[in-house]
Amino acid sequence: LELLGEGDFFHHYDSSDPLAQLLAMPQEIEAPEDPVLLRLLPNAYSDPEAALDFRRFTEPQLRGSKQRNLRLMREQLTILVDENHGGVIENIDDGLWLRGMNDLRIALSIRLNIDEKSFEKYELMPDEDEQKSICAVYFWLGWLQENLLSTITDL
């Protein structure tokens, strides 16, 4: 959420061009430099000009959608902890949670350089290694995602 922008990020996309403002045309948006953001908000085309043009019209909504998903997840988890609901979140939006968990796993996988051999590496990490607990969160989110998908498909 911190990378995507905690507050309303749309003002960053407003153009300073009066005609563009009148026509509600967003300004050009550069691809993010942060590897996590680049993975969460990828280029749609290999052609740089086409990618920037596409990004200009889609990134604000995509970023906003990802922000909303993560904010709602945080709110529901906060309520769960504050009101001691016994580990059950009421009225869950399955799609929102799946998308949010996927974005969290993508962010963690980039930061931790997760690959197909990472679970074996994780098991060999000493308990004192700071990354071990973060890796545990990554794998736990995968387990949680899989269980949510199983529950949805069983309905």
Give residue spans per PLM region:
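Charged, alpha-helix-forming regions
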Residues: 1-68, 72-87, 93-155
